[in-house]
From Swiss-Prot:
It comes from Haemophilus influenzae (strain ATCC 51907 / DSM 11121 / KW20 / Rd). Its main location: membrane. The chain crosses the membrane at residues 11-31, 43-63, 90-110, 151-171, 195-215, 223-243, 274-294, 295-315, 328-348, 447-467. It is found in: Cell inner membrane. Keywords: Cell inner membrane, Cell membrane, Membrane, Transmembrane, Transmembrane helix, Transport. This is Uncharacterized transporter HI_0020. NCBIfam families: dass (TIGR00785). GO terms for molecular function: transmembrane transporter activity. Belongs to the SLC13A/DASS transporter (TC 2.A.47) family. DIT1 subfamily. One of its GO terms (cellular component) is plasma membrane. Pfam families: Na_sulph_symp. It is a multi-pass membrane protein.
Length: 479
C-alpha cells in the first residue's frame, strides 16, 4: 500500500529526531552524528518523494544550518556557510550549463534531423533500427547531462513514431517491433550515460562524493578514455541482447519512407541548427583539450551556453523554462554540500576506522573490489533514482573499498560506471525507464531478464576487459 504524504513526512522527521535523542557512537562527534540523521532523512526523502528533489534538499540545508548553529562544538569543525559549498562546485555548474545544449537539440529540431538521417541510412531492419538508436544516443550523450531529457525528449518520440509507422500496437501487436525497440531505447541510454562524464548528472556527483574519501579525481577526456573500451563493447552488444530476448516479428523496415516523411516535416536545415552543430563540435573540442587550452570543462560549458544565447539558438526564457536544469542545480548542489558537511565533521573518517576493524579483507584488495562492485549492481533493485543511489551508497562503497585495500583507481572507475549500467536491472532504475516502459509494449518479466543480463554482463566485462584496459592506461600515465 502506498504511503500518504503525511506518513512520509513523519518518517523523515523521525530519523533526525532519533540522532538527537540517542548519544553519538564512540569516536564520532556530536555534530557529525546529528548531520548524519539529516543526511539519512534526505536520502529516504529522495526515495519516498513526498516532495521533489529540490524541496527535499533545500529543507535539508535549512535544518542543517539550524543544527550547526545550535550544537555545542559544531563550529570548530563546520561553519553554517559550508552547507552551501555545493553551489560553488564547478561540476554543479558544468551540469547546469550543459543542459542548455540538451535543450537546444530539442528546441531547434537538430536531434530529430540527425535521427531521421540515421534511420534513412542504416535502419533497413529492426535490428539496424536498434543500432540507429545506439548511435544517436551516443552522439547526443556528451551534451545532454539529463539522460531522461535525451531519451524521453529526443529519442523516444522518434522511435515511438517509427514503431507506430511499422504497425506495432501496444495491445494488439507489441511483439511486431515495439517491444524490442522500446526495451533497446532504455538499455542503450543506461550505457551511453557513463561513456562521457557529461552524459548523466550523477556521474559528476559520484566523483564529487568520492573525492574526499579516495582522493580520486579525473578529467573529461580521461573519463572517456577509461569508459571507451568496456563501454563501447557493452553498447555494441545491447541491441543484439535485446533482439535475442525479445525478437521482433517484423524484420524488414521501409526506412527510406519513414526518414523522408520525417525530414519533410522538419523542412530545410535552419541557421540555428547549423550554428548548434558548430557549437557542439566546439564543446567537444574544448572538453577534450581543456588541459592544453588551460580552461576547465565548466568554463567550456559556460562559453557554449552564452554563445547559444548570443546566436539566438536558445533564449534566456528557454533556459528559464528548462525545469530539469534548475531542479538539478538545486538538488545536486545541495547533496554535494550535505556530503561535504559529513566529511568536514569527520564522519567518513570515523566510518573508515570503524569498518576497518570489522571487515577482514587484508591482502585481498581485488576480492574486496569484486564484492563491492557486485553489491553495487545488486542493490539497484532497491533504487528508483540514480541520484538517490549515488548519494546513499557511493560514499559507503567507496569507504568500504578504501579500508579493505581495494585499488583506488579501479574502485573509483568501477563504481562510477556501475552507477549507470546497474540501473538496467529494472524498468524503474532511472528516469528514461518509465517513459519507454510506459509506452505499453513491454512486460516486466522480459524487461527484467534483459536488464539482468545486460547489468551483470556489463559488470563482468568491466571486471575483466575494463580493468585490464584501466591498468594499461595507468601504466602509460594516461589515467
Amino acid at each position: 500500500m502506498a504511503l500518504s504524504k503525511n506518513t512520509k513526512l513523519v518518517i523523515l522527521m523521525a530519523i533526525p529526531l532519533i540522532t538527537f535523542l540517542l548519544p553519538a557512537p564512540d569516536g564520532l562527534s556530536l555534530i557529525a552524528w546529528r548531520l548524519l540523521g539529516v543526511y539519512i532523512a534526505t536520502i529516504v526523502g529522495l526515495v519516498l518523494k513526498p516532495y521533489g528533489e529540490p524541496v527535499i534538499l533545500l529543507a535539508a540545508i535549512a535544518v542543517s544550518g539550524v543544527i550547526i548553529g545550535n550544537t555545542e562544538g559544531a563550529k570548530e569543525l563546520v561553519k553554517v556557510g559550508n552547507m552551501l559549498d555545493g553551489y560553488k562546485s564547478g561540476t554543479t555548474w558544468l551540469i547546469f550549463t550543459a543542459f542548455t545544449l540538451s535543450s537546444a537539440f530539442v528546441i531547434t529540431g537538430l536531434g530529430k534531423r540527425i535521427a531521421y538521417h540515421m534511420i534513412g541510412a542504416m535502419g533497413s531492419t529492426t535490428l539496424r533500427l536498434g543500432y540507429v538508436t545506439m548511435f544517436l544516443d551516443l552522439l547526443l550523450s556528451p551534451a545532454t547531462p539529463s539522460n531522461t531529457a535525451r531519451s524521453g525528449g529526443i529519442i523516444f518520440p522518434i522511435i515511438n513514431s517509427v514503431v507506430v509507422a511499422l504497425g506495432s500496437d501496444p495491445e494488439k501487436s507489441p511483439k511486431k517491433a515495439g517491444r524490442y525497440l522500446m526495451m533497446n531505447v532504455y538499455m542503450v541510454v543506461k550505457t551511453t550515460s557513463y561513456i562521457f562524464l557529461t552524459a548523466m548528472a550523477p556521474n559528476a556527483l559520484a566523483l564529487s562524493l568520492m573525492a574526499p574519501i579516495l582522493g580520486f579525481e579525473t578529467t573529461w577526456i580521461k573519463w572517456f578514455l577509461a569508459a571507451s573500451v568496456p563501454g563501447l563493447l557493452c553498447l555494441f552488444l545491447i541491441p543484439l541482447i535485446c533482439y535475442w530476448v525479445s525478437p521482433p516479428e517484423l524484420k524488414k523496415v521501409d526506412n527510406k519512407a519513414i526518414a523522408k516523411k520525417g525530414l519533410e516535416e522538419l523542412g530545410p536545415m535552419s541557421f540555428r541548427e547549423k550554428a548548434l552543430s558548430v557549437l557542439f563540435v566546439i564543446a567537444l573540442f574544448g572538453w577534450i583539450f581543456s588541459n592544453s587550452l588551460h580552461i576547465n570543462a565548466t568554463i567550456v560549458a559556460i562559453i557554449v551556453m552564452v554563445l547559444c544565447i548570443v546566436l539566438s539558438i536558445v533564449t534566456w526564457d528557454d533556459i528559464l523554462k528548462s525545469k530539469g536544469a534548475w531542479n538539478t542545480l538545486v538538488w545536486y548542489g545541495g547533496i554535494i554540500g550535505m556530503s561535504g558537511l559529513l566529511e568536514k565533521s569527520g564522519f567518513f573518517k570515523w566510518l573508515a576506522n570503524t569498518l576497518s576493524t570489522i571487515l577482514q579483507f587484508e591482502g585481498h584488495g581485488m576480492m574486496a573490489l569484486i564484492v563491492i562492485l557486485t553489491l553495487s549492481v545488486s542493490v539497484r533493485y532497491l533504487f528508483a533514482s540514480g541520484g538517490a543511489y549515488v548519494a546513499a551508497m557511493v560514499p559507503v562503497f567507496a569507504t568500504v573499498g578504501h579500508v579493505t585495500g581495494a585499488p583506488t583507481e579501479l574502485l573509483a572507475l568501477g563504481l562510477v560506471f556501475a552507477n549507470s549500467y546497474g540501473g538496467s536491472v529494472t524498468h524503474y532504475g532511472g528516469g528514461p525507464g518509465p517513459i519507454a516502459f510506459g509506452a505499453g509494449y513491454n512486460d516486466i518479466k522480459s524487461w527484467w531478464i534483459t536488464g539482468a543480463i545486460i547489468a551483470f554482463g556489463s559488470l563482468i566485462i568491466h571486471l575483466t576487459i575494463g580493468m585490464a584496459w584501466w591498468k594499461l592506461l595507468m601504466s602509460l600515465g594516461w589515467l
